[in-house]
UniProtKB/Swiss-Prot annotation:
Monomer. Binds 30S ribosomal subunits, but not 50S ribosomal subunits or 70S ribosomes. PROSITE patterns: RBFA (PS01319). The lineage of its organism: Bacteria, Pseudomonadati, Pseudomonadota, Alphaproteobacteria, Hyphomicrobiales. This is Ribosome-binding factor A. Residues 1-22, 125-144 are annotated as: Disordered. SUPFAM superfamilies: Ribosome-binding factor A, RbfA. Keywords: Cytoplasm, Ribosome biogenesis. It is found in: Cytoplasm. It comes from Bradyrhizobium diazoefficiens (strain JCM 10833 / BCRC 13528 / IAM 13628 / NBRC 14792 / USDA 110). PANTHER family: RIBOSOME-BINDING FACTOR A, CHLOROPLASTIC-RELATED. One of several proteins that assist in the late maturation steps of the functional core of the 30S ribosomal subunit. Associates with free 30S ribosomal subunits (but not with 30S subunits that are part of 70S ribosomes or polysomes). Required for efficient processing of 16S rRNA. May interact with the 5'-terminal helix region of 16S rRNA. Residues 134-144 have a biased composition (Acidic residues).
Length: 144
């Protein structure tokens, strides 16, 4: 009876090496396209859009592209503009990244920056500051 091996994702949940490599190629291509201003959309003019991450599906046919407008403003407008230009962007990515199939693209706001800011604010609260400033040696003496 043949064994069926199930591929496990890496510990970070990023997928296989191939998914990570292709995702990085797509990220570079998309960042280059957006930086060159090749997308002619009034809603994108005046916005600098960063592409911090691209996640590929296991079959490499879907690319989830995480974007963040510089300054974090107008995220909904930028996502809508990118979605309107999805066909053009998919074609440009296909020209720049050598794959058997051009991946379908979908755009999401990268919320990691907001989460990092939230954690930073928590660390600055008085209660946490008090805990951080507490002498670690005094805790050890109390435990003994």
């Amino acid at each position: 009876m043949p064994r069926h091996h199930q591929k496990k994702s890496s510990a970070s949940g990023g997928g296989s090496q191939r998914q990570l490599r292709v995702g990085e190629q797509v990220r570079h291509a998309m960042a280059e396209i957006l930086a060159q201003g090749n997308v002619h959309d009034a809603d994108l003019e005046g916005h600098i859009v960063t592409v911090p991450e691209v996640r590929m599906s296991p079959d490499l046919k879907l690319a989830t592209i995480y974007v963040m407008p510089l300054g974090g403003r107008d995220t909904e407008i930028v996502i809508a503009a990118l979605e309107r230009n999805k066909k053009f962007l998919r074609g440009e990515v296909a020209r720049r990244v050598n794959l058997k199939f051009a991946p379908d693209v979908r755009f999401r706001v990268d919320e990691r920056f907001d989460e990092a800011e939230r954690i930073e604010k928590l660390l600055r609260t008085p209660a946490v500051q008090k805990d951080l400033e507490q002498d670690p040696d005094s805790d050890r003496e109390e435990e003994q």
